[in-house]
């Protein structure tokens, strides 16, 4: 295998050139910014997020994996938990990883297809949540937040199962309050619905493929001022394993290049750094033993995020859980 090649990821403004590259078989992904631009149609038309073509029964909307009709129809649950010391992440279908001032924040974990007996310690609302969550219309379990962010969640009609309004869904644990999927569902208001299929999935038995992909066995990301984080591909498990504690395994890894902005929060008053997930930008998608440069776009909080390759073709991901890293400007990425 060739040595890993590093690149500097720069947050791209709306309409800027997007990452693209060609990768030869057996070579580390040669991900260079500005080699090509996604088509305008790809940037304005959301891909159809479909279930696997060969599926003969119900599938989980966020993973594409076979499940029961009852599970497929139940709502998703969103919970912020710390990455270090967090419990329940291996049961999540989607995880969003965000940074603040070079410090890794509590990740936003989305549960739908699996029951998690213990999740936590449960965190509060973050400024990015009103932009991330509406497309999933989940039940949001949280411990509260600044008045402005909570108001935006209410405006987006995101049902909240908070520690103050639904205490029966929580229990005291080491480091804070803990919850569970059954506890949140039992305390949830009526009328919650299942999320849409937010990622197009490859057909049953098919791998993540694109003509722009190259072989990948390790992925190392280094945000400015933060420790490096390495993911390693397990061919036996057909999954990507995150280094460190807790160990997590996912089918898909999306390294999404986004701007960050200082946000003034009220009640309590403080500044917070928040990922800006609306607009478009560059990304790298990793699935199976391959990685490909791509571009992402999200037109509104209610719209799902679309991912297309350098030719503007929607990516079709491997069945299973997905981890999305919201990379700040100046981050470095090495794919080997």
Language model features by range: what are they?
Residues 34, 55-66, 70-92, 103-110, ...:
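A surface/extracellular/periplasmic glyco- and lipid-processing/surface-interacting theme
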Residues 19-22:
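C-terminal motif of bacterial Sec signal peptides marking the signal peptidase cleavage site
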Residues 1-11:
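Bacterial N-terminal signal peptides that target proteins for export
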Residues 24-27:
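Bacterial signal peptide processing site
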Residues 36-53:
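Extracellular mucin-like PTS domains
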């Amino acid at each position: 295998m060739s040595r890993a090649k590093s690149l500097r990821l720069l947050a791209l403004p709306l309409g800027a050139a997007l990452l693209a590259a060609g990768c030869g078989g057996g070579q580390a992904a040669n991900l260079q910014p500005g080699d090509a631009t996604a088509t305008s149609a790809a940037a304005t038309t959301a891909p159809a997020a479909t279930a696997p073509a060969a599926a003969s029964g119900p599938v989980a909307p966020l993973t594409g994996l076979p499940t029961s009709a009852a599970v497929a129809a139940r709502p998703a649950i969103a919970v912020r938990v710390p990455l270090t010391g967090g419990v329940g992440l291996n049961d999540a279908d989607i995880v969003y990883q965000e940074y603040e001032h070079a410090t890794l924040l509590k990740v936003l974990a989305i549960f739908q297809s699996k029951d998690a007996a213990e999740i936590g310690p449960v965190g509060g609302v973050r400024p990015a949540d009103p932009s991330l969550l509406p497309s999933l219309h989940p039940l949001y379990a949280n411990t509260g937040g600044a008045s402005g962010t909570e108001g935006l969640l209410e405006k987006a009609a995101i049902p909240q199962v908070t520690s103050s309004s639904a205490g029966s869904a929580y229990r005291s644990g080491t480091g804070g309050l803990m919850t569970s999927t059954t506890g949140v569902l039992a305390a949830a208001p009526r009328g919650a619905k299942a999320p849409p299929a937010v990622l197009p999935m490859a057909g049953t038995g098919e791998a993540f493929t694109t003509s722009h992909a190259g072989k990948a066995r390790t992925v190392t990301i280094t945000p400015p001022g933060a420790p490096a984080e390495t993911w390693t591909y397990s061919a036996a498990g057909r999954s990507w394993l995150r280094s460190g504690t807790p160990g997590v395994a996912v089918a898909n890894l999306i390294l999404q290049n986004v701007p960050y902005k200082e946000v003034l929060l009220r009640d309590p008053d403080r500044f917070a750094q928040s990922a800006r997930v609306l607009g478009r930008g560059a990304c790298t998608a990793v699935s199976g033993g391959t990685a490909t440069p791509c571009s992402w776009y999200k037109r509104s909080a209610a719209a799902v995020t679309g991912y297309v390759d350098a030719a503007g073709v929607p990516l079709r991901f491997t069945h299973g859980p997905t981890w999305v890293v919201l990379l700040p400007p100046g981050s470095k990425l090495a794919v080997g």
